[in-house]
A protein has these predicted regions:
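Exported/extracytosolic protein signature
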Residues: 1-284
Length: 284
């Protein structure tokens, strides 16, 4: 909406006087909103956005252009975009009825053109974008995504913004190795378990993380360490020498969160996973 003013001047017999200033307001006939179906994002995750254009006027609005900035932000003198449009994902509805997809320029920025909103009606544009390497993965990260609508019949561009925040999550993988690879009876062997967390949230005791393994052949005379510290059977782990079943006590496996660095040149984020290491050594 826009405020306008007007003032008149009266002249007479070589004199003049000004009227009061009259104020008026041009109301927008188009109301634009933008919402995200998912309130959070994670690296590589798809986010679904819904843009609604509602025409409160008595004439249709034709040839509108909807420009989506894909969350672009300034970095190192340029603009980087934390969202990548998913090609072919756009769906358009007019008054709830599916229509042909609009003309799309993937950008960035993303542009939908030739949009018509009927008088007293609405258009809904649904599209998807993927959080990419420029999306902040650390706790507190956010993407501010703005659409701008322009075209004939609008007194000024109309914008709407939606913010999604990064999801606090753990993302764990585990690998196992044995040394030495070739052994004979009564040799000592070591199993090494490496747990990696590429998520932004640490694994803490209340998460009750645990490892279970059955050693075959069965091991005897176990020694166990976690991140270099010795563990005690019955306290941090349990082992059945009759079956070879090894289990850590839930809550003893702790894994730090990943750390993230934004490249000072490109602006892309890279992750260094948090790592925890469990070793189990025994005699075959």
């Amino acid at each position: 909406m826009a405020i306008f003013t007007n003032q008149a001047t009266l002249t007479y017999n070589g004199s003049s006087t000004n009227s009061n200033i009259a104020y008026g307001e041009i109301l927008d006939v188009l109301v634009v909103t933008k919402t995200a179906v998912e309130g959070n994002y994670a690296p590589g995750q798809i986010v679904t956005y819904v843009v609604t254009l509602r025409n409160t006027g008595n004439a249709s609005l034709n040839g509108l252009v909807v420009t989506d900035d894909l969350g672009g932000y300034e970095f190192n003198g340029t603009t980087v975009y934390p969202l990548t449009y998913e090609a072919g994902s756009v769906v358009l509805f007019t008054n709830g009825v599916p229509q042909a997809a609009p003309t799309v320029a993937a950008g960035p920025p993303l542009v939908f053109s030739d949009i018509t909103v009927p008088a007293g009606g609405d258009v809904v544009i649904v599209s998807q974008a993927q959080a990419n390497a420029f999306a902040d993965p650390a706790v507190g990260g956010r993407i501010d995504n703005t659409v701008t609508v322009t075209g004939d019949g609008l007194s000024a561009p109309i914008t709407a913004t939606e913010t999604v925040t990064v999801e606090a999550q753990q993302a764990l993988t585990i690998s196992k190795s044995i040394t030495p690879v070739q052994v004979v009876d009564n040799d000592r062997v070591t199993y090494t378990f490496v747990i990696q967390n590429t998520g932004n949230q640490a694994v803490v005791a209340t998460d009750n993380a645990a490892i279970t393994d059955t050693f075959d052949p069965i091991l005897t005379a176990l020694t166990v360490t976690f991140d270099g510290a010795a563990w005690t059977q019955g306290v941090q782990y349990n082992y059945n020498e009759a079956t070879g079943l090894f289990t850590t006590v839930p809550g003893q496996i702790l894994v730090p969160a990943a750390t993230y660095v934004q490249d000072p040149v490109t602006g892309a984020y890279t992750a260094t996973p948090g790592i925890a290491t469990l070793t189990v050594t025994g005699t075959i």
